[in-house]
């Protein structure tokens, strides 16, 4: 039988230092997730009234709340648990490392799920979904929500062939503002930059997190195999 005991460093120190460094990197990236998620939540919060006024509530709410809110929450948890990870690694707390591994593994699954969902969203499908809802709202009683959206996106009408009236466009006196700047194009640019950034950041951080989990598992194994005095604090 192959002896695997020599495959790991002989002292926990050689494992905990890289683990602490990885946690510091993940803490910084957690702040990035908080910032990116906050920007997306702030941007997509402008679609709240529009989502309520449209028939595609479930599809649009998933886009406008689930993904950005998920990224924001994950970022906050990262900031908290990476600090915990640094502490338990430095102190070589065995039980703390086990709990840290379990929590980070759960976060890894969620992060890859959210990041994968964001990065696989097809921009054309999103725009078609929003475009259909846009025309529905334009013909409804709550079409004033479009004026607020157009003012936010600095655009007028969904496209040059859409049926929504330019009467809903923001006006500067009698002059229509943003004429010729269509909302479909403006929204497409915004989604391309924000949603894909969320997905790419999530997957990249997930890879680094996986390495950190492996180091913490190796550290747990090495601590268990290391000789300890009676006063050794394994908790």
UniProtKB/Swiss-Prot annotation:
InterPro entries: Tetraspanin/Peripherin (IPR018499). Keywords: Glycoprotein, Membrane, Transmembrane, Transmembrane helix. Glycans are attached at residues 62, 139, 143, 160. One of its GO terms (cellular component) is membrane. Its main location: membrane. Disulfide bonds: none annotated. It is found in: Membrane. Pfam families: Tetraspanin (PF00335). Residues 40-68, 115-200 are extracellular. Residues 1-18, 90-93, 222-235 are cytoplasmic. The chain crosses the membrane at residues 19-39, 69-89, 94-114, 201-221. It is a multi-pass membrane protein. Belongs to the tetraspanin (TM4SF) family. This is Probable tetraspanin tspA. It comes from Dictyostelium discoideum (Social amoeba). The lineage of its organism: Eukaryota, Amoebozoa, Evosea, Eumycetozoa, Dictyostelia.
């Amino acid at each position: 039988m192959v002896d695997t005991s020599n495959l790991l460093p002989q002292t926990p120190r050689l494992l905990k230092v890289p683990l602490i460094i990885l946690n510091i990197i993940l803490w910084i990236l957690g702040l990035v997730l908080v910032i990116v998620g906050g920007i997306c939540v702030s941007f997509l919060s402008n679609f709240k009234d529009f989502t309520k006024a449209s028939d595609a509530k479930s599809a649009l709410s998933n886009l406008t709340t689930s993904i950005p809110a998920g990224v924001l929450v994950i970022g906050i948890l990262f900031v908290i648990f990476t600090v915990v990870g640094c502490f338990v690694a430095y102190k070589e707390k065995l039980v703390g490392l086990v709990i840290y591994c379990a929590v980070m593994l759960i976060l890894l699954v969620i992060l890859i799920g959210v990041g994968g969902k964001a990065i696989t969203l097809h921009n054309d499908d999103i725009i078609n979904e929003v475009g259909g809802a846009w025309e529905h709202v334009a013909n409804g009683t709550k079409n004033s929500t479009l004026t607020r959206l157009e003012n936010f996106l600095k655009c007028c009408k969904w496209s040059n062939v859409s049926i929504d009236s330019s009467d809903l466009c923001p006006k500067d006196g009698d002059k229509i503002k943003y004429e010729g700047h269509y909302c479909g194009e403006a929204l497409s640019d915004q989604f391309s930059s924000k949603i894909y950034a969320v997905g790419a950041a999530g997957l990249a951080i997930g890879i680094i997190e996986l390495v950190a989990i492996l180091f913490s598992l190796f550290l747990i194994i090495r601590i268990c195999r290391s000789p300890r005095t009676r006063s050794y604090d394994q908790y």
